[in-house]
Amino acid sequence: MSLRTELLKSVWYAFTSLDTEKSGKVSKSQLKVLSHNLYTVLCIPHDPVALEDHFRDDDDGPVSSQGYMPYLNQYILDKAVEGTFVKESLHELCWTLTAKKNYRPVQTALSNRDAFHLWCLFNYLSEDSYPVIMVADEVQYLLQKLLSIALMEVTEVELGDVLSSLSPVVTVWEFLQVMTSPKFLKSMSTETLSIAIQDLYEEVIQDVLKQGYLLKKANLRRTWTERWFILKPSSLGYYLSEECKERKGIITIDKDCGVEILPDRDGRRCMFCVKTTSKTHEMCASDTKHRQEWVTAIQTAIRLQQSGSLSLHRELQKRRREQRELREQRRAARELEMQRLAELQNEKERQQQELEQLREAQKKSEEIMLQEQHRHREQQEEMKRQLECQLREAEEARASMQAEMQLKETEAVQQKQRIQELEQLQDHLQEALAQEIRARHDEEAFRHAQSKLLMQEEEKLRVLLRMREEQTQYVERAQKEKQELQQEMAVTSKELQEAQKQLEDVRENRERADRDVQVAQKKLRQASTNVRHWNIQMNRLMHPISPGEKRIVSGSGFQGLWGIPFTRRDSSLKRLQTLDGKDHTHPAGEHVETFH
């Protein structure tokens, strides 16, 4: 803790004691008086006129424009030099101001001097923050030091009972209340407590490492004289008596000093010496225990000088703070670890719950899947039944189609047979035509006689034309029926294409049969045309000659010309009429004249 921090803690108490309204504001007149007293106790030269200017009532002064804290740092604390003033005077000034307002002693348990010393100890060991507080560990350390100095043995249970009423952080007034509580004073007298407080104050505040009577060997006369020694980190002073009114000398302690235990000689026992760079100082303790205590204390002072530390208790306080911080870090780490473990446990429980939920969801999904599979199987079975039904219908349709195709094939065979018969008839007709042509040459001479026959032949021609038209209509109806049949077959083929693809072969066979039928029909039409043509010719030639006509011919010549051909025409005409009766139906009232 720096000098500024140490002084500022005491000044903070003085300032807060002047802030009666707890608003953080103090009148300028009070601050001017406080500042003047601080200048005085810190031995800082100051100009009263300048002080009056700083605290003027207008808003131009540094206190009005900046506030008191910057003024305190700039004009007072920055000018304070350690060693030029007595710290205790500053502490007494601030204690006087704050005690009037805040300290209410209980009867006479503590004197005002002892309370002041405890206040100084509290500020020394308090935290470097505002408001000034002390942690419970430092309170416990301070109480244990007091009890140790007072040679009082207090158990941890009793000490814990004293500290149980305190919060984790303690103000100085709460601390003084504990020091005056019956729990703490029940086994200690007021005088013992006062002595312990004084010794602890000297040890902690005044940095007294060790004090007591020792025999010192004079440097010139070599005589031994009893002196009161006070050991501090930087010096070992000795006085005429323990009142410390007259100092006889001082031994400066630095890092190059040393201490040694000397053997007994000249009737002196428990001797030791302190070696400095310029001189060796011999001393003698009352017994071995006291000598060892002094040697240890001097070694501590030398160690502090070597380490650059000016105060043992500052170093101890720093270590305790580091230990507290380390404990806090460990505690925070433990809490963090416990929190992390709790989070891990919660996460584990959450994952367990999620796992259970997943298991339940999986179970439900499996049930749904089984139901879906069952439903799918039922759908498949239903679809299978439908397909089987469709397949049966397709098979039936195919069988029907096959039967129809067989019927068509039978009809085609019959048509083929008729075509063959017609071809044979055509051959006969061609042969008859050849004969008729020859007869025509023979009959050219009789054209005039046969004019009437020509008229009749024209009538027959009209009849044949009507028959041709009827035959054409019949062929058109057959083609229309064929087209309708093809359309029905195409629709049936499309419906059965997915169920049975083998029907395509049947359809191809049917198409080939249709082409054969078309060829046969074409041939039939050609044959019919030829038949009609030859019928016309035959009818023309088959008209009988009138009996009144007389021709001069020989019997053998007439018989040779007409006998045999007329017989052949008769038989051929009868066969033709038989075939035409099967294929054609003549209209009512019409007939074909034949030669008898």
UniProtKB/Swiss-Prot annotation:
The organism is Xenopus laevis (African clawed frog)
Which keywords, in A-to-Z order, does the entry hold?
Coiled coil
Q: What top-level branch of life does the organism fall under? A: Eukaryota
Signal peptide per UniProt:
none
Any one GO cellular component localisation term in the record: nucleus
Question: InterPro entries recorded for this chain?
Answer: EF-hand-dom_pair, PH-like_dom_sf, PH_domain
One protein family per Pfam? PH
**Domain PH, which positions?**
207-303
Read off the Gene3D superfamilies from this record. Pleckstrin-homology domain (PH domain)/Phosphotyrosine-binding domain (PTB)
* Any coiled-coil regions, as ranges: 311-541
- Name of the protein described by the UniProt record: Differentially expressed in FDCP 6 homolog
